[in-house]
Amino acid sequence: MIAVGLGVALGVEYRREEFTDDRDDRLDGTIFFTDSVTGNVIPSDVMGSSPTPDTDGDRDVFSAFAELAVPLVSEDMNIPLVHRLDAQLAIRAEDYSDVGSVAKPKVALSWYLHPDFQIRGAYSQGFRAPNLEQINATGIRRVNGGREDWILCEATARANGTDFDTGDCDSVSVESVRSGGPDLQPEENDNISIGMVYQPSFVDDLTFTLDWWRIEQEDVVGIFGDQNQISLDYVLRLNGSSNPNVVRADPTADEVALYTAAGLTPAGEIIEVADQYVSLNPREFEGIDFGVNWGLDTDQLGTFDFKVNAAYLREAFQAPSAEANQILAAVESGTADEAVDVPGSEDRVQQNGRPEWRSNASVTWRHEGWGAGLSYNYVGEVIDTSVTGPDGEIFVVDSFETINLYGEYTFAEWLGGDTRVRIGARNLTDEEPPIADEFASGYFPSLHSNRGRYWYLDLRKEF
C-alpha cells in the first residue's frame, strides 16, 4: 500500500544552440607578421598573441523528462523501524542533432528509521554533451613553456657519456595545436551515494550528516596533453619510430652529429604538437563528506550558528589510454628514464587541483540587530605534476588556510528599515597562495586566491 501524496512532474524542451567565434583578421591568422630584418613569418599580427581561427557551430536539442515522487510509508502507518519511507524515480532523455541521443534514469530512497535518524541513498546515470567548441574548433594554437623534450635529453646524455639527469634537461616552449573532435560522443557517468542524517531530538537544531559517494565516468572529453605527446614521441623514437602528432623540423648538422653519437635517429626541434579533443578512458572518483550544524538560541546572548564541513577524496583514478600505457610500460621496463611520467593518468588524488582533504568551519552570532561571523577554510596540499625538484623529486604545493571575519548591524528604521551595514575582512591573516608551476599566475587559481587581506564595507537595503 502506498501512502497518500504521490507526486508527478513531466516536461519537454527544445533548444537551439549556436556558437560563433569571429576574431579580427590580425588575430585569426588571416594577416601574418613578417620580420623585415630576418624574414621570419609569425602567424599573428599582434605581439604576444597566438592565432585563433574563426570557429562556428550549431545544433538542435530535443529533451523530455519525467519524475515520480512516491511516499511508500507514512508516519501514521505504524510500521516498526520505518517511520517514513519515500522514493523518487526519474528519467531524462535528450536528442542532439550532432552527437546522438541519450536517456538516463535516477532512483533515490529516503528511509527514516526514527524521527531523529534518516538513511538516504541514490543511484543515477548522467550525461554531458561535448560543447560546440570541442566539436568544431579548428586548430587553436597556443605556445606552452616548461615542456621537456626527453629524446633530446637522452641524446645529450648518451653523447656526453653521462647518466640521464633531469636537472640537465632544459625546458622548451612548444606550440600546441588544439582542434575539435567531430566524432565525439556524450560523456556518460554512473553516480551512487549512501548517507545518513542524525538530528537528536534532545538537542535543538543539531544535525550530523555523513555521505559516501562514487562517480564513474566514461568518454570524458579532454586532451592527451602536449607533454604526454612529446613523452610518447620519446618512447617511440627509442624504438625506431616516432609520434606523428609531434611535428619536428629537419635536424641541423649539429643535431645530426649529436644523435648519431648517441646511437639514435636524428631529430630536429619541435615545431608544433597536435593535441585534438578526444574521448578519454574511464575515470573513477570516490569520497566521503562530513557535516555538523548546530543552532543555539539563548535568551540573553542571542543566536549562534556553528557549522563544520569536511570532504575527503578517497579515490580519483584515470584509466590510462593505450598511448599512456606505452609510456608507463617503457618506464617500468627501464627503456625510458624514470623521470618520464604521464600527468593526469592513473591515481590522481592530490595531483594538481585534487587535494585529499578540504574543510571549512564557521560561527555566526545575531542579537537585537547586531551580528558577527568568523569562518575558517582549509585546502590540503597537492602535487604539482608539471615541475620537479633539482633531484627529480615531486614538487609539493603546501596546504592553504584562510580566515574571514565580519561584523554588522541591521537598522530597524534608518532608510526606511531593514538596512544592514557590514564591515569585514577576508583573508584576515594576509596569507599568500602557495607557489605552483601549473599556471602562468604561479599558483592554482582553482584552489587558492592571490588576494591578500582586504577590508570591505557593505550596505544592503531590503524592500
Where on the chain are the PLM-derived regions?
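Short loop/turn motifs that connect adjacent beta-strands in outer-membrane beta-barrel proteins
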Residues: 1-6, 73-85, 116, 152, ...
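Outer-membrane beta-barrel transmembrane domain signature of Gram-negative proteins
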Residues: 1-82, 320-353, 358
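Transmembrane beta-strands of outer-membrane beta-barrel proteins
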Residues: 6-10, 64, 83-89, 105, ...
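Surface-exposed extracellular loop regions of Gram-negative outer-membrane beta-barrel proteins
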Residues: 8-17, 58-110, 189-193, 375-377
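Transmembrane beta-strands of outer-membrane beta-barrel pores
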Residues: 14-20, 72, 91-97, 123-129, ...
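Gram-negative outer-membrane beta-barrel transporters
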Residues: 80, 211-386
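Outer-membrane beta-barrel signature, preferentially recognizing the C-terminal barrel domain
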Residues: 130-208, 273-288, 352-357, 450-454
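C-terminal beta-signal and adjacent terminal beta-strands/loops
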Residues: 216-219, 314, 375-386, 409-463
